[in-house]
Curated annotation (Swiss-Prot):
Protein name: Hydroxyacylglutathione hydrolase
Enzyme class: hydrolase
Catalytic activity from the UniProt record: an S-(2-hydroxyacyl)glutathione + H2O = a 2-hydroxy carboxylate + glutathione + H(+)
Enzyme Commission number(s): 3.1.2.6
Gene Ontology molecular function: hydroxyacylglutathione hydrolase activity; metal ion binding
Organism: Pseudomonas paraeruginosa (strain DSM 24068 / PA7)
Amino acid sequence: MIQIDALPAFNDNYIWLLQDATSRRCAVVDPGDARPVEAWLAAHPDWRLSDILVTHHHHDHVGGVAALKELSGARVLGPANEKIPARDLALEDGERVEVLGLVFEIFHVPGHTLGHIAYYHAAQTPLLFCGDTLFAAGCGRLFEGTPAQMHRSLARLAALPANTRVYCTHEYTLSNLRFALAVEPENQALRERFEEATRLRERDRITLPSEISLELSTNPFLRVSENSVKKKADQRSGQQNRTPEEVFAVLRAWKDQF
């Protein structure tokens, strides 16, 4: 049984900590800062950091990798097509890798960056570590990829089992939900999610992980084929957007300025 906890970092990052109590081994995902992980390891001296999983090359995801590698000797896994510090295993789309006894399939999900990957574990309750591709009620900015690339990447993730737990890397949920409500103000599921997320943040609790089913009902970037979303995108752009990719592009540009 793997326990997953969030280690807060910077202003709004989460470093996901996977723990196998039987072996006293742990793994972390996207440690942009080594200090939260170092503090946890210092408080748990009988545990060993065995693996560091990286989704993409941005500093707030890799800034702590080298120090943690030096401290623990952990294996560093990351995308083959990006420069990742101290990487031991370069991962391509479709490959499988075992971490703490869990087998993860690698998805290449370009958009936020061109080499971005996600880690997917198929199980009764599937797990998805998706970095800055799919957020709770949102998606990552397009720093390197195109709207078409990101739309395809999100469509791939949206097709995963509805109960897949989504572990993204930022506490952007309230901001994303405010934008989502601007797109679909009459979406009752969305209004309820905003109220729940607000209550959680008021108690200083995190809003993650999410689930694919929740994203399908409330994330505008996964709802670009819905008439309500297309209508709002058409109003925003002043023209008829003929394809879901075009609707997505309008939404992403709007969110960048929101």
